[in-house]
Amino acid sequence: MNAQVSFLDGTYTLIHIPLNLYSTLLQPILRVLLPQSQSQGNLRDSPEYELQGLTSDGQHGFLNISITPLECSVVCHSSWAQNVFEPVLKTLPRDVAKSVSVSKDSYMILSVISAGLDAGGRVMELTSPLALAGIPIFFITTYYSDFILVPTKERDNVAKSLLAKGFELCENESNYVTQGYKKGATQPPVTPPHEGLPSNVSEMQKNTFGLLKKRHVTPHIEEGLVLVQCSGREASQLASFNHQRPSISRHTTGNGRRPSWADNVDTKLYTCIISALVSQPRFMSVTLAQDDPPSLLLDKNLLDVFGDSLVGDTEGCLIPIFLNLESLSLEATGIVCGVAGILVQDPQIAESSELSYLSTAQAGAVILSDEQSVRAMGILEPLLTKEP
């Protein structure tokens, strides 16, 4: 596998919102989605003023908002969690606010750009070294890239694990590159596992399914829910759509003020995203990353809301298999690797180009084609069903 892995700047927070509080917390969700709504009074006019977690043109370094049949989950820069969500939570009755979970530990995000490996193999290649090192992760597959959330406190262990797997440290110490394994090539020695950690992937998978079974985690498919994976348009495509608009300097606009966030985005797409969010969709996951156009995994029934603002295979039919992980702590390890590893042992699933994974705060979803989802349920159900 040819892959480039890099740490994104900043630290991030994971937020779980119960579905019955979604409408209550929709306003802070939209404030995070639309950065210009984060008002700081006159400070906004200061040329040196920049909101944390945003690029120079006002875009999020990373943001994921996911609404599923199990929960609403938000991954945002820690400053946004502190300055936008936490003040709202303090206004709620204590017993209500307690049902919202804001991660105490911060996370780093690894951005992965890879080629030359099937989808299932890619998930395994990226997650297995971290799982074997006892590092808890959250995995988000998007239209263009894979993103892995790891605890900030585990940064050194992440680096060691990647190096041991054959990733090479680039001049920029935040980047790792691997060219895959070559027959006969010497690999860095792997440190023996710490006490209590699995020594190989098979042992890790056994531990994972033992834990899931003990916590009564069972796979399920939501009847009638079909997803599509799409993207917003590339910047070059947007330029052709908006060729009549004057060029915008990132320092000032024609009226002497700094350009707003809206000057640099596809406002039609964002209007559609807001419309879908306001409707409390059955399923929608939006990922914004600074080097990619917006990526959306959404209920196929929402396509009419978006019109021609999306690109991608809108005729596809992807089925999510949900795992409710609310009984597990955020420190649980090996879930993504364990589940994906079992599935890719099936030859047909292993060859599928459509296997992906979405981690949310308290759940996980394996996403496959319609046919492969049936095979996957046939594999997972016997492993996670307790004998009478």
What are the functions of these language-model segments?
Residues M1-P388:
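A conserved regulatory-domain signal marking ACT and ACT-like small-molecule sensing domains
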